[in-house]
Amino acid sequence: MKKRVTIYTDGACSGNPGRGGWGALMMYGTVNRELSGYEPATTNNRMELTAAIEGLDALKEPCVVDLYSDSAYLVNALNQGWLKRWTTNNWTTSAKKSVENIDLWKKILKLVTLHQVTFHKVKGHSDNPFNNRCDELARQAIKNNS
């Protein structure tokens, strides 16, 4: 039976584009693990995707995952079928434009085939302590690299 893991993620950018950070909080049973990172030149959406990638990539074996993010971009792409349509349409949007962040979406595709992931949208900057912690991790990563 696969382990059930909860992951909260968030990305932040100082300027968009600008310096960026991401944070992830992984929870399995009584064990919590925090991850974070920094990019010198990026966008908020790239940081949101990177947080999810890093959280999922840190899992040592295939798991059942509940992933919580305040990024509508990330959650809607998976839950509303955007990602599936983009791959079917050779990475073009319904407006016939090239999909942004293809490199990261390809990594997410690989990870969601390895793990059984359910994506959940949470309200950002509200009263969710786990999402707020991820925001702190992302912003601290930017601050630590200033």
Swiss-Prot record:
Family listed: Belongs to the RNase H family.
What role does this protein play?
A: Endonuclease that specifically degrades the RNA of RNA-DNA hybrids.
Q: Which protein are we looking at?
A: Ribonuclease H
Gene encoding this chain? Answer: rnhA
How does the cofactor bind to this protein, according to its record?
A: Binds 1 Mg(2+) ion per subunit. May bind a second metal ion at a regulatory site, or after substrate binding.
Give a GO molecular function annotation for the protein: nucleic acid binding
Q: Which Pfam families does the entry mention?
A: RNase_H (PF00075)
**Domain annotation RNase H type-1: ranges:** 1-143
Q: Which reaction does it catalyse?
A: Endonucleolytic cleavage to 5'-phosphomonoester
Gene3D superfamilies cross-referenced by the UniProt entry: Ribonuclease H-like superfamily/Ribonuclease H
